[in-house]
């Protein structure tokens, strides 16, 4: 396998990407193609499943051919994907019966309220680790069965298949032979029992979803089967699958209990490895599966922040303070601090650990002396404050003091933000040399399954530091900053609650 590579397919919310990795974990080639976002009604978000497949197959071929290689140069394929997004297709024709309903879609919010009113919340959380929410796949499947003509009858006859995006890609790569998913994607459906590691019949009955629709659940690192499409002339083992955030946790080599990563994108996704025992959160975090490798399941706590990098986009597009997102660091660095200004970017409510849907964006402490630089700094600081709130909830739930924070995603390139994050947390923020950790994680999982890499220890030896940000702020100053932030969050919530 000396001259072979691992192909990672990263099927995201706005684009399909493919990356080739060599044995040292370096990116050899990369290809990307965006696809259409479909908004049929306010709060509804859909994708065309055929476009998901065509763009992903296209970039897979492009990444390989652009460096003069072919399928024989690929040792294995790993898949990572946007989670929860729901596709239902006809087993006989292989065609979707409706568009993919995306994780952001809120059309089933009222139905979720009905499930809560039936007293199902505790049962769902105990079995799946998840709150009842339209974010997850279960109610999206139910909506398709209830609203697509003939769907319920076809499902009863066993003619329909459900899958998250990974399942849909594998189904197509194997010419409709394999209907599988992995434990990480299954754990995001609200139908999978994370303790028994099987679909939960009681929840399937409650949601009136036939078990025959569901894929077989497999480990995150194993050979599922060979490709059979014309995308590649040779058959390549499909050998790794993980949801995007779990893949990033693995790509960051957070393989020990208590290790944490934060992906700074449009929002933030924080995940802590909690080892081989699931921890039920008392602080509004999600309990989920991190991965299953070598027969062992690792669990994780996860917290999502709705607005992170998006606050920078707002400064650019909404206020016109900056012309491009990259300008914010220099502007914010023009002042030593915010001078008491706090921005709570609750443009779409507050995510973990607050989960307040009514809260709205709020700005506090503004004076005549407040400048665009202060606003820019307050915007960056808000990302670090929100992340700290989730990290403190993780520490409280797990009883583990975080030793360091591994960071990735677009906004992790902002040195000012990373330094402030380290200052608030009181431990180092650590940025790796390869920040494409999601694709890297998928590559690692596939490579382990075929022996391309011997074991996790070999992968640990590859992880390389790009920069370490050590805390430098006095703790008294940190405490003062945090008091101001907590006041601002309380006020933002109070404003939302006081509608009189």
UniProtKB/Swiss-Prot annotation:
GO annotation, cellular component aspect: cytosol
Sites where the protein binds sn-glycerol 3-phosphate: 13, 83-84, 135, 244
Principal EC category: transferase
SUPFAM superfamilies reported in the protein's UniProt record: Actin-like ATPase domain
InterPro entries: ATPase_NBD, Carb_kinase_FGGY, Carb_kinase_FGGY_CS, FGGY_C, FGGY_N, Glycerol_kin
Activity regulation description: Inhibited by fructose 1,6-bisphosphate (FBP).
Protein name: Glycerol kinase
Function, in words: Key enzyme in the regulation of glycerol uptake and metabolism. Catalyzes the phosphorylation of glycerol to yield sn-glycerol 3-phosphate.
Keyword terms, alphabetized: ATP-binding, Glycerol metabolism, Kinase, Nucleotide-binding, Transferase
